[in-house]
Amino acid sequence: MNNDNKRSAGGLGLVGDIGGTNARFALWRGQRLESIEVLACADYPRPELAVRDYLARIGESVANIDSVCLACAGPVGAADFRFTNNHWVINRAAFREELGLDHLLLVNDFSTMAWAASRLGADELVQVRAGSAQADRARLIIGPGTGLGVGSLLPLGGGRWEVLPCEGGHVDLPVTSPRDFALWQGLQARYGHVSAERALSGNGLLALYEISCALDGVAVRASSAAEVGALAMAGDAQADAVLEHFFLWLARVAGNAVLTVGALGGVYITGGIVPRFLERFIASGFAEAFARRGKTSGAYLQDVPVWVMTAEHPGLLGAGVALQQALDAEG
């Protein structure tokens, strides 16, 4: 997380969640999101132009915006930010100058999911594993989607939080059964090193399905993760078994991460896969498999609750929370 310059009095915040295809923007006013719009990145040569068009669409003056926080896909450092899946580049100095900003904050897109977890209401969460969260302990955020995002949220007291981004999606994929090992061998033949992300992602779900079909002598009927999910929902036994295995592997990876960071404050699942198949996920063996391990580690995990985040725009909310905390810290 990086910020620049000082806050001016009485300004209005703008937040963005920028992906490879779309950029979502909103105003941040009174610690709430307003005027959410989705724009196509391909329609704008530079992100500054997208911001200007967004403000024009909602009838807001650029002059009223003094603070911006953008969630960006990829590691955020001090240098200019180059998006990996679109043509945009953010030059910090040029961005601030063109929009007349006092404050610019860039954060990793998955970090905003962690920020959002500090603010979500009960109607934006579905509890999938019962437990008792310890308010003074870390929370774990994990999300299989295009990749496997992992991060943690640390309470600092006084309503303040610290987000610790990491590369937890690239830990080794755990193998605990003969079927795990057979699938792992198929992944290793394709990729060499088998990280958790190789299985717990959109591409991973498809790879698990293809390998599973080969192991069982079943014809492949899907060419995308979405098709695997659709087959499972339609009652296809092979696809359903793969989706179940996906959820069980997610349970073990999430449980391992809780053990590593001491996330007794609970686990928050996000990403594009689990919320899409929420009913099937709730019916899966995830909750039991999460703590099914050795005596000591199983006891440690036994009372850790798990939620699925169902908020419509958690990236924007998280960007707003990150911006608010940065501004409050400046006084």
Swiss-Prot record:
Enzyme Commission (EC) number: 2.7.1.2
Keyword ATP-binding: yes
Main location: cytoplasm
SUPFAM superfamilies: Actin-like ATPase domain
Cellular localisation: Cytoplasm
GO BP, one annotated term: glycolytic process
Reactions catalysed: D-glucose + ATP = D-glucose 6-phosphate + ADP + H(+)
Pfam families assigned to the protein according to its UniProt record, in alphabetical order: Glucokinase
The keyword ATP-binding belongs to this UniProt entry's keyword annotation: yes
UniProt binding sites for ATP: 16-21
MF term (GO), any: ATP binding
UniProt keywords, alphabetically: ATP-binding, Cytoplasm, Glycolysis, Kinase, Nucleotide-binding, Transferase
Entry GO terms, CC: cytosol
Family, similarity comment: Belongs to the bacterial glucokinase family.
Protein name: Glucokinase
Recorded name of the encoding gene: glk
